[in-house]
Regions:
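Nucleotide/pyrophosphate-binding catalytic subdomain
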Residues: 1-220
């Protein structure tokens, strides 16, 4: 979901099957080999804020990434208020987890508006304890309650929150975890995980040319 064209492609995939009711997006990744993932841009931006250095220019570049997606999709959507809040929270040292999570949060807002789905902030339903450990049972209960009666929703991946509202993230790539959590909560028949590579490979296709696929894999 790094560009407007990718959003359009994902939108077509989702709309191709009316049973695809709950969508869990990640933050914008690289548009090309020389590009930077938005999550890394957010980490770098917050590092400046943490060191009491000016971070307005770095934050502006992040905002421009999202605006290029919105403009490319010809949407009437403004993220001005969201970025004002982010700027304020960065200045108040809201934490690295908060900073990193904004990538998914903002992409979720765009995706929800693009699809016409309800936006559900995982900070309200995916719960971590005071030590930062994921609480599966509490999360399942909260998510079931939050999504009850919701026909279609976008739930950003990668993060949740402690009971006091402090944002906590999973490890990098945690949107896949969020997807499985949401699938369980809504008792989905199928959980589909779409990435830029089809299936499981025995090696990284960016390093090894045409690696063989793994047709069946066990898990525990």
């Amino acid at each position: 979901l790094a560009s407007a064209s990718q959003f359009s492609k994902v939108g077509k995939i989702i709309n191709a099957d009316p049973e695809r009711k709950f969508v869990v997006p990640s933050a914008p990744g690289k548009r090309n080999d020389k590009d930077t993932k938005v999550t890394d841009m957010l980490y770098a931006c917050y590092a400046l804020a943490k060191e009491e250095k000016s971070f307005s220019s770095a934050l502006k570049k992040i905002k421009e990434r999202y605006e290029s997606i919105i403009n490319g999709l010809h949407m009437k959507l403004s993220l001005d208020e969201e970025f004002k809040t982010i700027e304020k929270n960065f200045a108040e040292k809201a934490g690295e987890d908060y900073a990193a999570s904004r990538g998914e949060y903002l992409n979720g807002i765009i995706m929800a508006n693009y699809l016409g789905y309800e936006f559900v902030d995982p900070a309200d339903a995916i719960r971590f304890d005071e030590d930062g450990n994921f609480m599966p049972e509490e999360t399942d209960k909260l998510l079931k309650k939050r999504l009850k009666g919701v026909e279609r929703a976008v739930v950003p991946g990668f993060y949740g929150a402690k009971a006091d509202g402090t944002i906590k993230t999973f490890s990098r790539g945690g949107s896949d975890i969020t997807g499985s959590i949401v699938a369980k909560a809504v008792q989905a028949d199928v959980y589909e995980n779409w990435t830029d590579v089809s299936g499981f490979k025995i090696a990284d296709p960016r390093i090894i040319k045409n690696p063989e696929g793994i047709d069946i894999i066990t898990y525990s």
